[in-house]
Amino acid sequence: GEKSIYSEKKKVKLYYTNKTGDKLISCFREVEVKNNVPLETQVLLMLKNPPASKKNLKSPLSQDFHVNQTQIMNNTCYVDLSSDIENAVADVKEKITVYAMVNTLTDLDTAYQVQFTIDGKRVSKLNEFEKFDTLLTSNFSLCK
């Protein structure tokens, strides 16, 4: 028979940036968990669109941001991004972009560290951000 697409609602904590792009601000959102899209991919894509009701938030990601794949293995979330991640967001520091993703992913409790690749390759530097190819853990010092 046909495989039904299962879904349930889950509350997740997402990290957006403030208007000046130098601090992270978290907020809770509801996500519809689908069995055909990994939760990790879904929450990353949600970072492109802050809730309309929160006027003080902006997206830490460019609108052409795209996730190729996410996978959880050994408490690590492996995230393969498209090269669009290299398009800097106006007025947002790279470390804010990176840790918005890392903090959001590690808050899901499926992994405590994140390994990024771009189109399948480890990239040591993302614009101004060094060590983009290392295992990254959450950073709350950037939170407002």
What role is predicted for each listed range?
Residues G1-K144:
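Bimodal "functional hotspot" detector
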